[in-house]
């Protein structure tokens, strides 16, 4: 689903509306701008660059945008503090726990200050205690940052815990949409 929203996979039909604009109508340049400036992605498998430090991983979206090294490292340091990884900026992914790696992935998605976050099962690879802790941190952070988030999960309890509106899908089709209470 998230790969369809940002058109990494081309949908066969329908519309994808972001800010009342149909992403299906975007040309290549407009689509690239959407991906680089408006959408941040958090992946299930962390997708960190092993040859880059934590700070460089976080700063990567800003590097792609052409932001100066000093400005992107300043921004990355601020986000590092927000995700509670102060002091870990010079470490590499293999030196971090799974929960810490996922925090780096979230920090990288937030570094470019996107309007939208696409999160593809971001906590599913983590043990239950770390998963619960990161869910709590995400809830707190989402209240602070005020980002529209599409959070994909196969865990209904997680959806109810972190979601404001939930869409339940079966066989690729939405079968129900509502609030957690509904």
Spans of model-derived segments:
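Helix-to-loop junction immediately C-terminal to a conserved catalytic motif
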Residues: 6
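A short, proline-enriched helix->beta-strand linker immediately N-terminal to the Walker B motif
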Residues: 111-115
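Conserved ABC ATPase "signature" region
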Residues: 21-22, 63, 70-88, 140
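Conserved ABC ATPase signature
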Residues: 92-96, 100-102
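ABC ATPase "signature
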Residues: 177-178
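Short coil-to-helix segment of the ABC ATPase nucleotide-binding domain corresponding to the Q-loop/switch region
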Residues: 52-59
